[in-house]
Swiss-Prot record:
Cellular compartments per GO CC: cytosolic small ribosomal subunit
Gene3D superfamilies: 2.30.30.30, RNA-binding S4 domain
InterPro entries: KOW, Rib_uL2_dom2, Ribosomal_eS4, Ribosomal_eS4_central_region, Ribosomal_eS4_KOW, S4_RNA-bd, S4_RNA-bd_sf
Gene designation per UniProt: RPS4
S4 RNA-binding domain span: 42-105
Keyword Protein transport: no
Native species: Bigelowiella natans (Pedinomonas minutissima)
This protein's record includes keyword rRNA-binding: yes
Similarity-based family: Belongs to the eukaryotic ribosomal protein eS4 family.
SMART domains named among the record's database cross-references: KOW, S4
Protein name (record): Small ribosomal subunit protein eS4
Any one GO molecular-function label of the UniProt entry: structural constituent of ribosome
Regions annotated as coiled coil: none
Length: 242
């Protein structure tokens, strides 16, 4: 007889997006289903314990979440298992503190404090476009948002700056030469680079030639990149990151 999906997660088999102290215990908080995959995200409970230091153990961290004073992407979050990943925002309105989840230079998830003006803004990558009718199209982003548009200027691999409260598209970032990108996968995870050339191969895959801030060059696939700005300038504040 089938046992169904496992409801536990061991520390030794957890993803490597943040560093876990694997000798302090056997089990880790299992991420619930949500907008991010378990490979690229961590639970809200681990974020509270590791980065905000609001709790010493899991029981205290769960109580912090249940108070209802914590917002994720502009919406109240009451689940300590909620998946948190790249570009998500975490807010504490009572303390007037707002943070964004980014990749450190070591390729691990970390949080940086942001201004109040950016607390409801997020960069999402377009992964699929569906033709709903002759004029309207449905855009699916990397965090599983479905956005309806009536123009065809947006393409797959582009990025969108959206308001998380009402899913309004504020600005579209094109995937083209000169765009500023964040590498989200592979050896250079967490590195910022500029697109210098987009070359098609015989297998119809696009190989992207990039140049880092220090002048070093590298090559990546389209799926490994997230456009975050234009003309070497990020559309969101990354002063602590760069």
């Amino acid at each position: 007889m089938a046992k169904g999906i496992k409801k536990h997660q061991k520390r030794i088999s957890s993803n490597t997006m943040i560093k876990y102290k694997k000798k302090l215990g056997i089990f880790n908080t299992k991420i619930s289903s949500g907008p991010h995959s378990k490979v690229k995200s961590v639970s809200l409970l681990n974020i509270i314990k590791k980065f905000f230091h609001l709790a010493d153990n899991n029981q205290e961290a769960q109580k912090v979440v249940k108070t209802g004073f914590l917002y994720v992407n502009g919406k109240k979050c009451l689940s300590h298992k909620f998946p948190i990943s790249l570009m998500d925002t975490i807010s504490f309105p009572l303390a007037n503190k707002h943070y964004r989840v980014l990749l450190s230079k070591a390729g691990k998830l970390t949080v940086y404090e942001i201004n109040q003006n950016e607390k409801d803004l997020k960069i999402c990558k377009v992964i699929k476009i569906i033709n709903a009718s002759s004029k309207n199209k449905i855009i699916i982003t990397d965090d599983l948002r479905e956005l309806k548009i009536n123009y065809a200027k947006i393409k797959v691999e582009d990025s969108l700056l959206i308001k998380t409260i009402n899913d309004e598209i504020v600005y579209a970032l094109k995937f083209e030469v000169g765009s500023l990108c964040l590498i989200t996968r592979g050896k250079h995870l967490g590195t910022i680079a500029v697109i210098k050339e987009i070359r098609k191969t015989k297998s119809l895959r696009k190989m992207i030639h990039l140049e880092k801030i220090d002048g070093k060059k590298l090559t990546k696939k389209c799926s490994d990149l997230l456009v975050i700005g234009e003309s070497k300038t990020s559309i969101l504040s990354l002063k602590h990151y760069i």
